[in-house]
């Protein structure tokens, strides 16, 4: 059992993983199409640990820009198709390095705005899949770029609210099951647009705090599922945004995250004794940030970027 965050080993794990991306390792091959997301997870973890300077800014930024398409959207890697998922990660990475100025903001924002549907929802790409994840991504990305006026915000918000369920949660579409990941997306989008008053905070807060497993202290994403470190982000961030985070046992959740670390080689897994990956490493450290763990920089619960980065963007003309 772990009693502290082994930040130095997580740093080494992430840097080794990034070095492997240049080789034909198994993990680099299976994650090739979503490398942009992996880069965001790894780099944001480094930023939260105050170690972003450990990577080559020029190398990362140059690679990110090779993933942009003529449409303005970004792909998960060079040679792949653009999607809003990867576009947000690309924008977030550039924000980390204070390089948003190299973007053709008009082009990127037009790409995102062009994916809004008549009912206010958003498609993820030209193939038309609709999901509240994409609503959050569009709103978050356009807010960072200061281009929310490019879309019909009222319709976007009304669509998100139409995905609210009787249990207070939100699903991926109207009538779909409540899920912590979708709840983060919907609550995050409502927070960014100033519409949190449309959330039943007590009802949703109860549903979210019920996600904590009594024995392990970990959180799950929906009823009758195993606890998973990634929900330390999805559930906690939502609770913070609706001011109900005091409804869970924070100390038990901290222990669950710390116990999910690989104490020898670094990295964090979905639960204790499982295999680590960059996805859970990021969400574990981000969860500790939300829990105000010592030595971890503060992350914004709506934008999923360090608070100092968001302050620099939103309070700079």
UniProtKB/Swiss-Prot annotation:
Annotated function: Catalyzes the transfer of a geranylgeranyl moiety from geranylgeranyl diphosphate to both cysteines of Rab proteins with the C-terminal sequence -CCXX, CXXX, -XCCX and -XCXC, such as RABA1A, RABA2A, RABF2A and RABG2. In vitro, can prenylate PGGTI targets with the C-terminal sequence Cys-aliphatic-aliphatic-X (CaaX) with leucine in the terminal position. Substrates with the C-terminal sequence -CSIL such as ARAC11/ROP1 or GG2/AGG2 are prenylated independently of REP and when the beta subunit is associated with the alpha subunit RGTA1. Required for male fertility and root tip growth.
What note does UniProt attach to the cofactor annotation? Binds 1 zinc ion per subunit.
To which protein family does this belong?
Belongs to the protein prenyltransferase subunit beta family.
EC number(s) reported in the record: 2.5.1.60
Q: Binding positions for geranylgeranyl diphosphate?
A: 179-181, 222-225, 231-234
Disrupted gene: phenotype observed? No visible phenotype under normal growth conditions. The double mutant plants rgtb1 and rgtb2 are male sterile, due to shrunken pollen with abnormal exine structure, and strong disorganization of the endoplasmic reticulum membranes.
One of the GO biological process terms: pollen development
**Taxonomically, what lineage is the organism?**
Eukaryota, Viridiplantae, Streptophyta, Embryophyta, Tracheophyta
Renumbered ranges of PFTB repeats = 7-50, 57-98, 105-146, 153-194, 201-243, 250-292
Q: Which reaction does it catalyse?
A: geranylgeranyl diphosphate + L-cysteinyl-[protein] = S-geranylgeranyl-L-cysteinyl-[protein] + diphosphate
Q: How is its activity regulated?
A: The enzymatic reaction requires the aid of the Rab escort protein REP.
Entry binding sites for Zn(2+):
228, 230, 280
Q: What class of enzyme is it?
A: transferase
Q: Which GO terms describe its molecular function?
A: metal ion binding; Rab geranylgeranyltransferase activity
Matching InterPro entries = PGGT1B-like, Prenyltrans, Ptb1, Terpenoid_cyclase/PrenylTrfase
**Which SUPFAM superfamilies does the entry link to?**
Terpenoid cyclases/Protein prenyltransferases (SSF48239)
Q: Which Gene3D superfamilies match?
A: 1.50.10.20
Kindly state which keywords UniProt assigns to this record, in alphabetical order: Metal-binding, Prenyltransferase, Repeat, Transferase, Zinc
What do we know about how this protein assembles, alone or with others? Answer: Heterotrimer composed of the alpha subunit RGTA, the beta subunit RGTB and REP; within this trimer, RGTA and RGTB form the catalytic component, while REP mediates peptide substrate binding.
Name-wise, this protein is: Geranylgeranyl transferase type-2 subunit beta 2
